[in-house]
Amino acid sequence: METYRMKGIYGEGDVYVLKTIEDWDEYEKLCRERNSDFLKYNPNFFSLKEDFEKYIGKVWQDKEQLRYTYNDEPVYVEYKVIAIEDNNPMMDWYWIVQNVDDDRDVKSILANSCDLKNGIKIK
């Protein structure tokens, strides 16, 4: 699990990036250590874990972004689901997707996202 420090308009906070199921387990342990009632207040936690296991590493096509046409068949922009990030386990999760032609790492993608435009640094 990678942890970054986010600076935003409401202050600073940690951003957790989960790329593997082992990262997920580490994050779950961290959340339970911080708050023993974590799962009580986050009933969707395990359904999100199932989604994570199903989609991580998968490639999907964006049917709204035509890349080119080959033999009169459309070829769409493809993205790979590379991670999810969370800056507040009680709030929202964000899927991190990467264009399959893009070779940037997760940190670069996060640094260019609108949520982190005010700066990000490795913790």
Regions found by a protein language model. Give the residues of each.
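Short, intrinsically disordered N-terminal pre-domain segments
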Residues: 2-4
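Acidic, low-complexity, intrinsically disordered interaction modules
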Residues: 6-116
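Mixed-charge, Lys/Arg-enriched low-complexity segments
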Residues: 118-123
